[in-house]
């Protein structure tokens, strides 16, 4: 079976390193499916999901807040602004962060950092979506 190495790295740490048969991510122009021997490319990633299908057929679900995807003949590298594996997301903390960001944006004052609050909201929504996908997968 043909594989491609996949690395997901954020500013804080390496999130994933391993062999994959398929990597799915959301680029600026839509969803990308990367398989072994894919043509080289570089694209910006939107906040959303990254799904890696491992050699044994397991699907690993990650939530990213955006970044860059680079494909070379033998490796896919995702440089994520932030990334987390769906099965490690703290749902209570994510809901709290989402509510806080929504509260800040609803009560805009002159002293708030709107871009930061919007980014916090996007990250929380992406993580909640990853949790929902994980729950649907586990139920089946």
From Swiss-Prot:
Keywords linked to the UniProt accession: ATP synthesis, Cell inner membrane, Cell membrane, CF(1), Hydrogen ion transport, Ion transport, Membrane, Transport
CDD domains xrefs: F1-ATPase_delta
Subcellular location field: Cell inner membrane
Major localization listed first in the record, in broad terms: membrane
Membrane topology field: Peripheral membrane protein
GO cellular component terms attached to this protein's record: plasma membrane; proton-transporting ATP synthase complex
Family matches, as InterPro entries: ATP_F1_dsu/esu_C_sf, ATP_synth_F1_dsu/esu, ATP_synth_F1_dsu/esu_N, ATP_synth_F1_esu_C, ATPsynth_dsu/esu_N
GO molecular function: ATP binding; proton-transporting ATP synthase activity, rotational mechanism
Function: Produces ATP from ADP in the presence of a proton gradient across the membrane.
NCBIfam families for this protein: ATP_synt_epsi, PRK00571.1-4
Family classification: Belongs to the ATPase epsilon chain family.
HAMAP family: ATP_synth_epsil_bac (MF_00530)
Quaternary organization: F-type ATPases have 2 components, CF(1) - the catalytic core - and CF(0) - the membrane proton channel. CF(1) has five subunits: alpha(3), beta(3), gamma(1), delta(1), epsilon(1). CF(0) has three main subunits: a, b and c.
Record's protein name: ATP synthase epsilon chain
Gene name tied to this protein: atpC
């Amino acid at each position: 079976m043909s594989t491609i190495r996949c690395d997901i790295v954020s500013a804080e740490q390496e999130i994933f390193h391993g062999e994959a048969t398929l990597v799915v991510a959301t680029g600026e122009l839509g969803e990308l499916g990367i398989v072994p021997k894919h043509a080289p490319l570089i694209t910006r990633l939107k906040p959303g999901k990254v799904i890696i299908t491992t050699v044994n057929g397991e699907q690993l679900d990650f939530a990213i807040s955006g970044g860059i995807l680079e494909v070379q003949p033998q490796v896919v590298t995702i440089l994520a602004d932030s990334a987390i594996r769906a099965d490690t997301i703290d749902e209570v903390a994510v809901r709290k962060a989402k509510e806080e960001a929504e509260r800040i944006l609803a009560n805009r004052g002159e002293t708030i950092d709107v871009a930061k609050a919007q980014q916090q909201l996007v990250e929380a929504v992406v993580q909640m979506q990853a949790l929902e996908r994980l729950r649907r997968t586990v139920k089946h």
